[in-house]
């Protein structure tokens, strides 16, 4: 496919990293595609909070913390034409991007200036799920380190041990990852 930028004569390259060799990603110069690793929390009202950014005092990737990737909120649109399915992605609402990314919508209906996606699969520490580095995923596997494997039906109860507004991977998390793959590598 061709991006809108390509149609304007602006060509960007995204090459995946291989092993320890970082790939090229021209997209990161744009806010929509630039991520910052953070510690985050979700309050009792369902609002996301960035508690610390990587490099700041108090930030850690290990232990009883939630590690995520924060980026600016975005809007999207999808056109299904006879020739192709066209995805639109923008930092603002337009005719082509009428829908906010779900993870950008606050519980009160306002649009957050940022959205957060977990960086790591949830692992178990003392019976509570944490998205932190080095944990075996609590995904139903029988690994000794997983302690309390989680089933599909038990995910809601398990994630709510952190608070009533925490959840596991959602269809919107998957849509975001797929959308980034389509935009950058299609």
Residue ranges of model-derived segments:
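Hydrophobic structural segments
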Residues: 69, 85-88, 103-104
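Short, solvent-exposed loop/turn elements at domain surfaces
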Residues: 77-83, 124-128
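Short aromatic-cysteine micro-motif
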Residues: 90-186
């Amino acid at each position: 496919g061709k991006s809108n930028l390509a149609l304007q004569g602006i060509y960007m390259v995204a090459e995946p990293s291989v092993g320890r060799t970082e790939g090229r990603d021209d997209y990161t110069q744009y806010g929509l595609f630039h991520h910052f690793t953070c510690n985050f929390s979700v309050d009792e009202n369902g609002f996301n909070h960035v508690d610390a950014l990587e490099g700041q005092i108090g930030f850690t990737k290990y232990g009883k913390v939630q590690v995520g990737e924060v980026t600016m909120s975005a809007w999207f649109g999808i056109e299904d034409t006879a020739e192709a399915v066209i995805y639109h992605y923008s930092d603002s609402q337009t005719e082509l991007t009428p829908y906010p990314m779900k993870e950008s919508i606050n519980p009160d209906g306002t649009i957050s200036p940022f959205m957060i996606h977990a960086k790591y699969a949830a692992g178990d520490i003392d019976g509570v799920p944490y998205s932190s580095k080095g944990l075996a995923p609590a995904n139903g596997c029988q690994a000794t380190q997983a302690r309390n494997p989680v089933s599909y039906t038990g995910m809601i109860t398990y994630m709510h041990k952190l608070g009533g507004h925490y959840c596991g991977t959602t269809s919107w998390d998957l849509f975001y990852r797929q959308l980034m793959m389509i935009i950058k590598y299609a």
